[in-house]
Design a protein with these regions (language model features):
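Canonical positions in the second alpha-helix
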Residues: 5, 46, 50, 83-84, ...
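Register position in tetratricopeptide repeats
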Residues: 21, 25, 32, 70, ...
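Alpha-solenoid helical repeat scaffolds
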Residues: 14-18, 24-25, 57-63, 93-97, ...
Length: 218
């Protein structure tokens, strides 16, 4: 069998490659079943063999990353991601994956910062991609700030979000609510007008506009 041959000739390249393929197949099956802890040793066998084949290595590291994330072993996930980006500088998912992991580690501000620098350096196509990613993390973070009574922080973060995506419905709502609580009436008015502009039929913005008009009468 292949296993016996591998035990006899552990340095034979073709046998190692065949063994690696077998381990990858096993890992795939286990991962499909959600058995990430069981899949991990199979994946690590491949990545630790340093097979002189970038495709094989890349696939093994990708799977290891997925296992670590699903097992909530985030430090190891970050280390694996570092390995991937070192060997594959053009790895496109790097920013998204890193931001996702940082957010899971309660380092959301760091994750948002990562997106901001990616947005600054990206072309138009990738920019949209990163802005969507940014918004996905920013909205729950702003909500968390609001609930914790960190209104100023919530306001700052929602303004950042709107500057990236001016039509962000939730971004605008949080900016309006937080500016109102902070007594920033000019901003309250500005973001209400922006909301009405994008969502003229939306009752939330109409109600806020009524508040603005009421205040102007006084």
């Amino acid at each position: 069998t292949l296993k016996k041959m591998y035990e006899m000739y552990p340095d034979d390249y073709d046998i190692t490659l065949a063994m690696s393929a077998q381990h990858m197949k096993k890992a795939e099956k286990l991962m499909e079943l959600g058995l990430y802890a069981e899949a991990l040793p199979h994946v690590l066998f491949v990545s630790q063999k340093h097979v002189d084949d970038n495709e094989v290595n890349g696939a093994a590291w990708e799977k290891a990353l997925s296992c670590y994330i699903n097992m909530k072993r985030y430090n190891e996930a970050l280390a694996t991601l570092d390995t991937i980006t070192l060997h594959f500088p053009d790895y496109e998912n790097g920013t998204l994956k890193r931001a996702f992991i940082l957010d899971k580690m309660d380092k959301t501000e760091e994750a948002l910062q990562l997106y901001l620098s990616a947005i600054e350096q990206s072309d138009e196509d990738m920019r949209i991609f990163y802005v969507i990613g940014y918004e996905e993390l920013a909205v729950p973070y702003i909500k968390k700030c609001m609930e914790a009574g960190a209104t100023k922080k919530a306001y700052e973060e929602s303004v950042k979000l709107i500057s990236l995506n001016p039509s962000s419905d939730l971004g605008l709502r949080y900016a309006i609510n937080s500016s109102g609580l902070l007594g920033k009436y000019d901003e309250f008015e500005k973001y209400t007008a922006q909301g009405i502009n994008y969502y003229p039929e939306e009752p939330f913005y109409q109600a806020k506009r009524a508040t603005v008009l009421e205040r102007d009468k006084r």
